């Protein structure tokens, strides 16, 4: 489907206090574009553009990323009347169980992950399978900044400025066969650098696996991200390559991807394997379908705290119903959650 993008609107930035209260899936583990806008800014064209991320901690960008960054299409997609979550909070309040189950564990432990060199395998039902160094994998793609809402299944949310490219561009390159119906994503499995994979949480069968229907992956909102906040992805946020599907709960957006497979059958995903009654394959943000242990009708937008929870009503498809609703026409979204 095509996205009709209305006129540009600005996203505000504001400070945020660290989150102190959150819902967590650790209990389970231990027990067994609406409002979109587009504007083309082909490079860091002005001091104002660069200053938006002046407070962002500098990373160690790989050469290929540094070379591509100046031609990024800045603010290619934005959201109206939304404050961008400050970088510190977006990088220190994370779910990435490969590095631990507490929200601060990924930032504390992910420094051990080596992201250079990095290899991505493309296989399955494609005309052009291959094994690529990440710098070669990225060569064909124009980077875009996409400012998206992020809604976690745990009922908290952020607004993140990602840098990446549409999955549809990748699919055009690899040429799916007529048998391809789904796309399967696989995270790195490396217990040496990922301490969470060495833990006693045997319920997770590594590597982490996620998937999309092919038409979902083709939607213009679905991207593969390599950066955020004007720089490369930090390790704790899924470096060097992660999925971003803003109308779905955050656990669908698999991190540190090493394999992308086109398949004919619906892949069995990690959380679906652990608790299918709680985490379905589709995982679309839906305020009408509660998690068995908490409501999904509301969310806590960071910043929030004990005395300032910053609650808001959750929007269908996380506010992207106009862009993605037709993908699920005729489906029972209570059954296919």
Curated annotation (Swiss-Prot):
<keyword id="KW-0479">Metal-binding</keyword>
<dbReference type="Pfam" id="PF00174">
    <property type="entry name" value="Oxidored_molyb"/>
</dbReference>
<feature type="binding site">
    <location>
        <begin position="253"/>
        <end position="255"/>
    </location>
    <ligand>
        <name>Mo-molybdopterin</name>
    </ligand>
</feature>
<keyword id="KW-0574">Periplasm</keyword>
<keyword id="KW-0732">Signal</keyword>
<dbReference type="InterPro" id="IPR022867">
    <property type="entry name" value="MsrP"/>
</dbReference>
<feature type="binding site">
    <location>
        <position position="187"/>
    </location>
    <ligand>
        <name>Mo-molybdopterin</name>
    </ligand>
</feature>
<dbReference type="GO" id="GO:0043546">
    <property type="term" value="F:molybdopterin cofactor binding"/>
</dbReference>
<feature type="binding site">
    <location>
        <position position="242"/>
    </location>
    <ligand>
        <name>Mo-molybdopterin</name>
    </ligand>
</feature>
<comment type="similarity">
    <text>Belongs to the MsrP family.</text>
</comment>
<dbReference type="GO" id="GO:0030091">
    <property type="term" value="P:protein repair"/>
</dbReference>
<feature type="binding site">
    <location>
        <position position="237"/>
    </location>
    <ligand>
        <name>Mo-molybdopterin</name>
    </ligand>
</feature>
<feature type="binding site">
    <location>
        <begin position="97"/>
        <end position="98"/>
    </location>
    <ligand>
        <name>Mo-molybdopterin</name>
    </ligand>
</feature>
<feature type="signal peptide" description="Tat-type signal">
    <location>
        <begin position="1"/>
        <end position="50"/>
    </location>
</feature>
<dbReference type="InterPro" id="IPR000572">
    <property type="entry name" value="OxRdtase_Mopterin-bd_dom"/>
</dbReference>
<protein>
    <recommendedName>
        <fullName>Protein-methionine-sulfoxide reductase catalytic subunit MsrP</fullName>
        <ecNumber>1.8.5.-</ecNumber>
    </recommendedName>
</protein>
<dbReference type="GO" id="GO:0046872">
    <property type="term" value="F:metal ion binding"/>
</dbReference>
<comment type="function">
    <text>Part of the MsrPQ system that repairs oxidized periplasmic proteins containing methionine sulfoxide residues (Met-O), using respiratory chain electrons. Thus protects these proteins from oxidative-stress damage caused by reactive species of oxygen and chlorine generated by the host defense mechanisms. MsrPQ is essential for the maintenance of envelope integrity under bleach stress, rescuing a wide series of structurally unrelated periplasmic proteins from methionine oxidation.</text>
</comment>
<keyword id="KW-0560">Oxidoreductase</keyword>
<dbReference type="GO" id="GO:0042597">
    <property type="term" value="C:periplasmic space"/>
</dbReference>
<keyword id="KW-0500">Molybdenum</keyword>
<comment type="subunit">
    <text>Heterodimer of a catalytic subunit (MsrP) and a heme-binding subunit (MsrQ).</text>
</comment>
<dbReference type="InterPro" id="IPR006311">
    <property type="entry name" value="TAT_signal"/>
</dbReference>
<feature type="binding site">
    <location>
        <position position="152"/>
    </location>
    <ligand>
        <name>Mo-molybdopterin</name>
    </ligand>
</feature>
<dbReference type="GO" id="GO:0016672">
    <property type="term" value="F:oxidoreductase activity, acting on a sulfur group of donors, quinone or similar compound as acceptor"/>
</dbReference>
<feature type="binding site">
    <location>
        <position position="94"/>
    </location>
    <ligand>
        <name>Mo-molybdopterin</name>
    </ligand>
</feature>
<dbReference type="InterPro" id="IPR036374">
    <property type="entry name" value="OxRdtase_Mopterin-bd_sf"/>
</dbReference>
